[in-house]
């Protein structure tokens, strides 16, 4: 059971959170897709062979996390160049994940349906990220 002090802290947190801007990196559709992709990668890689724990499993998870983390970090950068640099790093991690998807299928760690689902998810993430970058380049309300 929580006490009065904890309830007061929770109320302060809720009040602070309600004053935060409504548009955060979590609002970016590319980040949302990337996050869903990461969760799916974690789910699938739980079934990879134990001897891949520090190999493909670790690398695939790290690359998936990198996509969404760089979108989040890039969002907070002030200049277009900085934003685009982090989003470009995300695109590099997307390419890395494409490789791990193919490798996972070729090693029979995932089936054809899982392969297609992963590939579709990563392609959607890439398309959304490219569109977001195009908006930044065209200066659609993003600070220089």
Model-inferred region functions:
Residues 1-73, 77-144:
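Short, C-terminally biased terminal segments at protein or domain edges
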